[in-house]
């Protein structure tokens, strides 16, 4: 509406579905079509063809910065060829899912008066869809130990969570490359940031850091250990963050909108990083507004809104 009042002729919307609910997206679609009929133009940038096709009158597929094909609303949907990379990965995920440890008895439980109670078991991937885009922001401070819930608690193996320094729980924030890396620390120091509970004196031990470098050089790349964090690529930053949490070895990992603003190949890589936790038996709770991508790994889907489950 600000764009309408300002008299703009072109409005660019990027990854809108990652921070508004399905109901809000449907309302937005109606608003866009209303003003499109009045002469305004909209450029809708999305990671998913199906999402863009539902809203837009014309859809373009891009690869390596180039448009490879355009579709009008009346055109037949593209062949799976255009999405072969994600389909191949989906098959890979299904094969790996069959080999994963099956969820056992519930080990992590969240209970709170007036909030959705949930539990997650070893090796399980639980996807929580926030239907009104309110629950995630309210739960994250509680899950990370920054705030205490007045009428609830988190139980891990029957023991309450012990505050934000409790390494039994890990929270991977939304857009973690902007909030979970420390540019004033070296690559190895960033990697060891949550390892102090497992290795005594890790900060002053050159021997431990040398051992970690040797062990993870093949996985992360030898060159990254000598680079400033700010010079890492997007992929290398995600590798660093997820490997740090992997080394932390928490009882449960909460991921907030893990695929937000990630292009297709990076989303596939993030799925592989999440799968490492699951293969190790570490449960993963994906907290998202949009279900795209998340369901490929999900054992269960929990749809929540303020006041309880749906």
State what each model feature region is.
Residues 1-2, 180-244, 248-251:
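ABC-family P-loop ATPase nucleotide-binding domains
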Residues 14, 20-21, 256, 262-263:
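ABC-family nucleotide-binding domains
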Residues 25-38, 267-280:
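Helical segment within the ABC ATPase nucleotide-binding domain
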Residues 45-47, 287-289:
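H-loop/switch region of ABC-family ATPase nucleotide-binding domains
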Residues 52-54, 294-296:
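A short, surface-exposed alpha-helical micro-motif characterized by mixed small hydrophobic
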Residues 69-109, 206:
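Pre-NBD coupling/linker segments of ABC/ABC-like ATPases
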Residues 130-199:
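ABC ATPase nucleotide-binding domain signature region
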């Amino acid at each position: 509406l600000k764009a309408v009042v300002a008299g703009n002729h072109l409005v660019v919307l990027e990854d809108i579905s990652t921070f508004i609910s399905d109901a809000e997206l449907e309302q937005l679609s109606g608003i866009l079509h209303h003003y499109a009929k009045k002469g305004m133009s909209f450029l809708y940038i999305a990671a998913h063809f199906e999402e863009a096709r539902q809203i837009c009158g014309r859809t373009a597929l891009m690869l390596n910065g180039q448009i490879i094909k355009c579709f009008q609303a009346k055109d037949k949907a593209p062949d799976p060829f255009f999405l072969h990379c994600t389909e191949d990965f989906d098959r890979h995920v299904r094969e790996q899912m069959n080999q994963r440890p099956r969820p056992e008895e519930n080990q992590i439980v969240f209970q709170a008066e007036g909030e959705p109670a949930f539990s997650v078991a070893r090796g399980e991937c639980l996807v929580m869809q926030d239907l009104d885009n309110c629950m995630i922001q309210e739960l994250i401070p509680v899950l990370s130990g920054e705030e205490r819930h007045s009428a609830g608690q988190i139980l891990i193996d029957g023991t309450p969570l012990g505050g934000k320094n409790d390494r039994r729980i890990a929270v991977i924030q939304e857009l973690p490359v902007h909030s979970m890396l420390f540019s004033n620390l070296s690559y190895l120091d960033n990697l060891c940031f949550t390892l102090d509970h497992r290795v005594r004196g890790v900060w002053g031990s050159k021997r431990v850091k040398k051992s970690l470098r040797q062990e993870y050089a093949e996985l992360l790349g030898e060159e990254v250990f000598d680079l400033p964090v700010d010079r890492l690529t997007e992929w290398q930053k995600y590798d660093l963050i997820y490997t740090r949490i992997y080394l932390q070895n928490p009882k449960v990992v909460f991921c907030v909108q893990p695929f937000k603003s990630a292009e297709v190949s990076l989303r596939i890589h993030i799925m592989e990083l999440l799968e490492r936790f699951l293969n190790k038996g570490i449960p993963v709770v994906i907290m998202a507004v949009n279900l795209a991508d998340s369901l490929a790994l999900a054992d269960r889907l929990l749809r929540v809104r303020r006041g309880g489950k749906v």
